[in-house]
């Protein structure tokens, strides 16, 4: 049974699962679906065609599913899909997709979106990511799994960030960051591998293979695409293959400077 505060507004047509709680002065629109065990705190606004999974915690003053911040938006039927077990902290802004970007924004499972985080239209966010306070993903940005974005870091439209990458706080990211890498600065550039994150999740032999590949790709003065193609074909490491595939398919380029 759901627990809805008497001052909350839940429009006719909204679907709430078992043990959903809705706090004081929250608003749930008519096209919203919220699955079992999710809590919505006071003054949160959830509207539009928004689907929210199980056991999410949505904190006060979040704005979820409000129309995209895109001047081309003309009232099309667009969607926001949120998975399970996410923590969406205070004053977070999550927009649905647009017709020009597939009409859907997708958020995976187990993510922590800290205060004042913004996910723009058509963003694709994987699982188990951490976006620190004030991080901003512009339209069409794609993040893999286990990505960390530091506080107050904006990410440019259409940028892709691979699995287990980390972006330092107060950076400005305008190009693609390959999986397993660390980047920081304004504009952000590669600073090495995200060894802290890798050691928590990836065997040592895979990390050693990534270290060797990183040196050859970014530090030895060789043509990046040529090295990526060769390592993709020759390496027995799946992680190295993933790294090289990302580089080969990057559309915005990889920001790095070679050591002198």
Curated annotation (Swiss-Prot):
Q: Which Pfam families match?
A: Acetyltransf_11 (PF13720), Hexapep (PF00132)
Q: List the disulfide bonds.
A: none
Q: Identify the domain of life.
A: Bacteria
Can you supply a Gene Ontology BP term from the record?
lipid A biosynthetic process
Which Gene Ontology cellular-component terms appear in the entry?
cytoplasm; membrane
From the UniProt record, give the pathway where this protein acts.
Glycolipid biosynthesis; lipid IV(A) biosynthesis; lipid IV(A) from (3R)-3-hydroxytetradecanoyl-[acyl-carrier-protein] and UDP-N-acetyl-alpha-D-glucosamine: step 1/6
Keywords on record = Acyltransferase, Cytoplasm, Lipid A biosynthesis, Lipid biosynthesis, Lipid metabolism, Repeat, Transferase
EC number(s) given by UniProt: 2.3.1.129
Q: Which chemical reaction does it catalyze?
A: a (3R)-hydroxyacyl-[ACP] + UDP-N-acetyl-alpha-D-glucosamine = a UDP-3-O-[(3R)-3-hydroxyacyl]-N-acetyl-alpha-D-glucosamine + holo-[ACP]
Broadest EC class assigned to this enzyme = transferase
Q: Where in the cell is the protein located?
A: Cytoplasm
**GO terms for MF:** acyl-[acyl-carrier-protein]-UDP-N-acetylglucosamine O-acyltransferase activity
Record NCBIfam families: lipid_A_lpxA, PRK05289.1
Q: How does it assemble?
A: Homotrimer.
Which family, according to the similarity comment?
Answer: Belongs to the transferase hexapeptide repeat family. LpxA subfamily.
Q: What does this protein do?
A: Involved in the biosynthesis of lipid A, a phosphorylated glycolipid that anchors the lipopolysaccharide to the outer membrane of the cell.
Q: What is this protein called?
A: Acyl-[acyl-carrier-protein]--UDP-N-acetylglucosamine O-acyltransferase
């Amino acid at each position: 049974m759901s627990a809805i505060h008497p001052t909350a507004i839940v429009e006719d047509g909204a679907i709430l699962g078992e043990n959903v709680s809705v706090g004081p002065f929250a608003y749930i629109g008519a096209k919203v679906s919220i699955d079992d065990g999710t809590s919505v705190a006071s003054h949160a606004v959830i509207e539009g065609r928004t689907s929210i999974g199980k056991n999410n915690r949505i904190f006060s003053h979040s704005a979820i599913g409000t129309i995209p911040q895109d001047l081309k938006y003309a009232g099309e039927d667009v969607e926001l899909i949120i998975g399970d077990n996410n923590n969406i902290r205070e004053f977070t802004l999550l927009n649905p997709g647009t017709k020009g970007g597939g009409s859907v924004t997708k958020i995976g499972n187990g993510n922590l979106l800290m205060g004042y985080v913004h996910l723009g239209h058509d963003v694709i966010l994987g699982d188990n990511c951490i976006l620190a306070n004030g991080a901003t993903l512009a339209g069409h940005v794609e993040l893999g799994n286990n990505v960390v974005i530091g506080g107050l870091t904006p990410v440019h439209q259409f940028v892709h960030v691979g699995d287990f990458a980390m972006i330092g706080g107060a950076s400005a990211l305008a190009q693609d960051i390959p999986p397993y890498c660390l980047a920081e600065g304004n504009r952000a550039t590669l600073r090495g591998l995200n060894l802290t994150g890798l050691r928590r999740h990836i065997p040592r032999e895979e990390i050693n293979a990534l270290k060797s590949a990183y040196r050859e790709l970014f530090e030895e003065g060789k043509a990046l695409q040529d090295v990526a193609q060769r390592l993709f074909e020759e390496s027995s490491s799946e992680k190295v293959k993933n790294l090289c595939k990302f580089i080969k398919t990057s559309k915005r380029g990889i920001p790095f400077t070679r050591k002198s």
